[in-house]
Amino acid sequence: MNKLKIVNQEELKDWAEEIFKKNSFNMVDVSSKKETFRRALASGKIYVGKEVFDLIKNKKMPKGDPISLAEVSAVLGVKKTSELIPLCHPLPIDHTATKIVMNEVDRSLEVFCVVSAFAKTGVEMEAIMGVNAALITIYDLSKIVNPNLKIDNVKLLIKEGGKSGLWKNPDGLPKFLENIF
């Protein structure tokens, strides 16, 4: 039978460091940070091919309108981020919006998701998760027509807030987004 051992403060500190910091995953401690306005914009693309593109454009997809459902999925993705990515903090999301742009040239749909919150940590992962949820929903509704779909180029475009301030993707932004933040 193990007996309880009384330890001093120094031994307790060593024990806590051993248990909680070495060889384990830990959520970043944001308890001492102040809440500030945070915003992020992410994007991603799905190439669907001519047949699927035309069906979406003409609102004749067999399982319904992928664009409308993808916009709803993006909201759910944003809200569920901390449940799906283990070390993400649950955040009080103040706003999210999704825009899906159809590109007839390469037969793709590009998803843009913006998220904002007044929080202690950024909303980049929430924006990226919103994009991914929308893209996967489009994939799900389109695969019945053509399973040869390609999700590509999911990335953070802009983040704002916190001590690092404003960051814009060095690869540049689409022209219509250059002055968004």
Which ranges hold each PLM region?
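C-terminal binding/interaction regions
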Residues: 2-67, 72-89, 95-181
